[in-house]
Amino acid sequence: MNKSELRKIMSVKRNSLTDEEKIHKSRKIFENLLDTANLADVSCIFIFVSYRSECDTTPIIDYCIDNGIKVAVPRVNGDKMDFYVIRDKSELSIGSYGILEPVTDTIIYPDEKSLIIMPGLVFDIKGNRIGYGGGYYDKYISEYNLGLKAAICFDFQIIEENIIEVEDTDVVPDMIITDSRNIDVAKLRS
């Protein structure tokens, strides 16, 4: 299957989740993230604001804000994505593609102690990722390749075979955190 076919299949599957299933699975992802990443040691969490049937990132964002952990969320300008610090969710407004984006102007860049949370539609067991086709995260991480890169998704979004077509510009996360497991991609690829 090509990327387009895999995107379509996984979108249908993810969109079929009930609200209750999505809430439960998203909560488990949040708990697994807390078990895996020592957020107290993170200088800033770079995280997407969930949209439609994606894993709900609200609990992660709320937890970080409530615990004094710096939060940065993306805003797309043309073909470029930057991250902006937010202090609470009132600093978000509907932007590109109907996705909540920051209204603040405080751009921040990752450092060695940053945690970058990546979205995706499909992953294989080696961490190869199919996003939404814009390449925003691939470009951003290629330019600012610092910190720990973790993808979050529902477990059914992982294909056990290593079948995703890979391009030179594709970025692989260090780990994938799902509602039922944490995959150490860096270890599997070494």
Regions found by a protein language model. Name each.
Residues M1-D111:
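N-terminal active-site beta-alpha-beta segment that forms phosphate/nucleotide-binding
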Residues E5, V12, D111-I116, I125-N128, ...:
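Surface-exposed, charge/polar-rich loops and edge strands
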Residues V122:
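A short, acidic beta-alpha loop adjacent to the nucleotide-sugar donor pocket found in many GT-B
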Residues G133:
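Short polar/charged helix/loop
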